[in-house]
Amino acid sequence: MGRTIRFGVSLDSDLLEKFDALCDDRCYQTRSEAIRDLIRNTLVQQEWEDTDREIAGTLTIVYDHHKSDLAQRLTEIQHDHHGIIITSLHVHLDHHNCLEVLVLKGPGADVRTLSQRLISTKGVKHGKLSLTTTGQDLT
């Protein structure tokens, strides 16, 4: 980790007031902590755009496991991409609906491809990919 450097930021007073309210709402003890998180989030967003860069994330899907061979198709797709699936969690929401969470890590293009294949599978009711960083380039 590098040394900490102080720098000044000039803001419109209305913008600063809104930023301070955001800091309070999110329980930041200092503006610096909030600004660091904003910078990190922007850098992580930039990482996601690099399809070769390794990223991590979770994919959550909801589906009716009674739909004809849907569970089998989802399993086959996952086996086709086993190298980027770290682990998975399967939850029975009710008699028909299942929630599955996959923890993914790999090249951005591969993570997106797997996610789109699963989300677009006929019978999947909802899917959401939530990306983050591996943290290697952040301090």
Curated annotation (Swiss-Prot):
Domain of life, per lineage: Bacteria
Pfam families: NikR_C, RHH_1
Cofactor list: Ni(2+)
Family indicated by similarity: Belongs to the transcriptional regulatory CopG/NikR family.
Identification of the protein by name: Putative nickel-responsive regulator
NCBIfam families (alphabetical): PRK00630.1, PRK01002.1, PRK02967.1, PRK04460.1
Keywords per UniProt: DNA-binding, Metal-binding, Nickel, Transcription, Transcription regulation
Organism from which the protein derives: Nitratidesulfovibrio vulgaris (strain DSM 19637 / Miyazaki F) (Desulfovibrio vulgaris)
Residues binding Ni(2+), per UniProt: 79, 90, 92, 98
Keyword Secreted in annotation: no
UniProt cofactor note: Binds 1 nickel ion per subunit.
InterPro entries: Acetolactate_synth/TF_NikR_C, ACT-like_dom_sf, Arc_rbn_hlx_hlx, CopG, CopG/NikR_regulator, Ni_resp_reg_NikR, Ribbon_hlx_hlx, TF_NikR_Ni-bd_C
Keyword match DNA-binding: yes
Its job: Transcriptional regulator.
One MF term in the entry's GO annotations: DNA-binding transcription factor activity
Entry's Gene Ontology BP terms: response to nickel cation
